[in-house]
Amino acid sequence: MKTLLIGDLHLKSQLILPIVDKIIQTHNIKRIIFLGDYVDLHGQTNNIQLYAKDLTFLYSWKIDKEQNGIDVINLIGNHDAYYLLGEQAPFSIQNLEVFFAVKELLQDLKLQVAYQLDDYLVSHAGFNLIFDPKEWHFNLYTKEHEEELDILAYTIGPMRGGKALGGSPLWAHFRELELLPNQEFPKQIVGHTPKESIDISKNVIGIDTFSLYIDKDNKYQFIGNGDLLVYDQG
């Protein structure tokens, strides 16, 4: 069975998912794993229309795929976690009413922290040696684990501007997975850290190839080449 893994979307579902549709057809994809960060984009924290359109598009797309026999797994990204916790971050949408509407939309996506794909542990940012996956990470997130999600949301390493030794599986920098590898889970697939392309030659594979930055002319530019990862279980 073939699985398609998709990195951070950041309000680009309407741009990326039509491309994904073609890949589903071409490669006979039966499972899709989104690695989180569906929300928030530099310079768009007041763009209510973009949040509404993109998230409703994503939700409708997921329902359509599931109705057509495709399994769709949605993982939690660091940006998503603050909505689930009901705590606005500086990069969250600023309108409070819309913030909580986004929270409900994210809950409708049925999010979880991690997914085990054969030998590969899949998560938003990756598990370094400081964090091991817990049973609840592989199940639908519920309020029962709010305190634990809060810890993940606020454990940020120095490479991401925090004070912890290393980041949680929502916040770990890709370099942390190289410098502080989790020996129990050497093979991982992660997003979060922008990559120019996908390199499958190493144990830890980064697939965040859709990230943008704003250039000196105040225009959006892609950091990566838009690669997607197809995993074939044979």
Locations of the language-model features?
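Active-site environment of divalent metal-dependent phosphoester hydrolases
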Residues: 10-14, 39-43, 79-85, 128-130, ...
